C-alpha cells in the first residue's frame, strides 16, 4: 500500500485559519461506512445520530502553552523552545530554534528572568533536554509566559487561547489539541447526556508527531511517534458495559480511537491502563472497540487519513474528501467535521 494512495488535491484557501464564533456551528459531513452515502449537516445535528445507551469517548487532555520565546542570558540572542514532553521534575524534551544556539550548558531566560532554562543534553533527532529554574508553580509560570503551539499550517494569531482547548479539557500535557472535540459546547454535551447517551473520558497527550509528514513511500515502513495515554477503571467499565449491551462506542477523534484500540483485547474489552502507544492504524486493521468516529478533515498522505480509511474504507474516504473539497468544507484543526456512522 502506497502513501500516495492517500493523496488528494487541497486548495490552500480551504485550510481553516481561525475557529468559528460558535463551536457547534461548523459543518458536519455524515459518511455511511457501509454504503459510502454522504449527508451534509451542521455539527449540532450530531445529536440525531446518537442513540440512548451509546457511549461517546472524549479525550480530556489539555494543551500546554508550550511555545516559549526567550533570549540567551549572555548575549540576548533570540531563541524559541517548543516543549514536547516532561522527562521528570523540571526536565523537559523540546525543540529549539535556532538549534545552533542551544548548546549544552547554555542558559536562556524568558519573561525578564521569571523563567530560566539550562540546556543539559542533546537528545535524539537534535531535540534538547532542558531544565527549568523558576519561583512558584511551573504550570502558572508557563500559563503566563507560554504561547499556544498552533500547527504549522495556521498562520493567523489566535486571539483566545481557550479556542484551542476543548470545553472538557482537564489533564495538561498535549502539544496539540484533540481537534475533533473542539466542536462540542457545554450545552450540546448536556443535550447528549439528556438523550441517554453515556460520556466516557480518557487521556492521550497529543505529540508533535501528529504534524510530521510520512517520509516513506510504502505505508508498512512508517514508524509512529509514541504518546502517553491513560484510561481509568470507571470509564473502562462504562465502555465494557456498552459493548456487552450491544450498543455503540463512538470515539471522538483519532486520539481516542488509538487509545481504545491500544488497550482493547480480542474480546472487545478494555481495562484500566496507562502507558505509551505507537499504534499505527491503516487499511486492513480490524477495529476491536471503536464502532463509529467523529473526526476532522485531515492532511493528504497523513497517518490520520489512513486511520479513518481503515474504519470507513479507503474508497469511501477518498470520495468523501474529494466531495468535501468540491463543497468547500473547511479543513484541519479549526475546520469542519465528519461523522463516520
UniProtKB/Swiss-Prot annotation:
It catalyses: 7-aminomethyl-7-carbaguanosine(34) in tRNA + S-adenosyl-L-methionine = epoxyqueuosine(34) in tRNA + adenine + L-methionine + 2 H(+). Its EC number is 2.4.99.17. One of its GO terms (biological process) is queuosine biosynthetic process. GO terms for cellular component: cytoplasm. InterPro entries: QueA (IPR003699), QueA_dom1 (IPR042118), QueA_dom2 (IPR042119), QueA_sf (IPR036100). Keywords: Cytoplasm, Queuosine biosynthesis, S-adenosyl-L-methionine, Transferase. Pathway: tRNA modification; tRNA-queuosine biosynthesis. Coiled coil: none annotated. Belongs to the QueA family. Monomer. Transfers and isomerizes the ribose moiety from AdoMet to the 7-aminomethyl group of 7-deazaguanine (preQ1-tRNA) to give epoxyqueuosine (oQ-tRNA). PANTHER family: S-ADENOSYLMETHIONINE:TRNA RIBOSYLTRANSFERASE-ISOMERASE (PTHR30307:SF0). This is S-adenosylmethionine:tRNA ribosyltransferase-isomerase. It comes from Clostridium perfringens (strain 13 / Type A).
Amino acid at each position: 500500500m502506497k502513501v500516495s494512495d492517500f493523496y488528494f488535491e487541497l486548495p490552500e484557501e480551504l485550510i481553516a485559519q481561525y475557529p468559528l464564533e460558535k463551536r457547534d456551528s461548523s459543518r458536519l459531513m455524515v459518511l455511511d461506512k457501509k454504503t459510502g452515502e454522504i449527508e451534509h449537516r451542521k455539527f449540532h445535528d450530531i445529536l440525531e445520530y446518537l442513540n440512548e445507551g451509546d457511549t461517546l469517548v472524549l479525550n480530556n487532555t489539555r494543551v500546554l502553552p508550550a511555545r516559549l520565546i526567550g533570549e540567551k542570558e549572555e548575549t540576548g540572542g533570540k531563541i524559541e523552545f517548543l516543549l514536547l514532553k516532561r522527562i521528570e521534575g523540571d526536565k523537559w524534551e523540546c525543540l529549539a530554534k535556532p538549534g545552533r544556539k542551544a548548546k549544552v550548558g547554555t542558559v536562556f531566560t524568558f519573561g525578564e528572568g521569571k523563567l530560566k532554562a539550562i540546556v543539559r543534553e542533546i537528545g535524539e533527532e537534535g531535540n534538547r533536554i532542558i531544565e527549568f529554574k523558576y519561583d512558584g508553580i511551573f504550570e502558572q509560570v508557563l500559563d503566563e509566559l507560554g504561547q499556544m503551539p498552533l500547527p504549522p499550517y495556521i498562520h493567523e494569531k489566535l486571539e483566545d487561547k481557550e479556542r484551542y482547548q476543548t470545553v472538557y479539557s482537564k489533564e495538561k500535557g498535549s502539544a496539540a489539541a484533540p481537534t475533533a472535540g473542539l466542536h462540542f459546547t457545554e450545552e450540546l454535551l448536556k443535550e447528549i447526556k439528556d438523550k441517554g447517551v453515556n460520556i466516557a473520558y480518557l487521556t492521550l497527550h497529543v505529540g508533535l508527531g501528529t504534524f510530521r509528514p510520512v517520509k516513506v513511500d510504502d505505508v508498512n515502513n512508517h514508524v509512529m511517534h509514541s504518546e502517553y495515554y491513560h484510561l481509568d477503571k470507571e470509564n473502562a467499565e462504562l465502555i465494557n458495559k456498552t459493548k456487552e449491551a450491544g450498543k455503540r462506542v463512538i470515539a471522538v477523534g483519532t486520539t481516542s480511537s488509538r487509545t481504545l484500540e491500544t488497550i482493547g483485547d480480542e474480546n472487545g474489552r478494555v481495562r484500566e491502563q496507562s502507558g505509551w502507544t505507537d499504534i499505527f492504524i491503516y487499511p486492513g486493521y480490524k477495529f476491536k472497540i471503536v464502532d463509529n468516529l467523529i473526526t476532522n478533515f485531515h492532511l493528504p498522505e497523513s497517518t490520520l487519513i489512513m486511520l479513518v480509511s481503515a474504519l470507513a474504507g479507503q474508497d469511501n474516504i477518498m470520495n468523501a474528501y474529494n466531495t468535501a473539497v468540491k463543497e468547500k468544507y473547511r479543513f484541519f484543526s479549526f475546520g469542519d467535521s465528519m461523522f463516520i456512522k
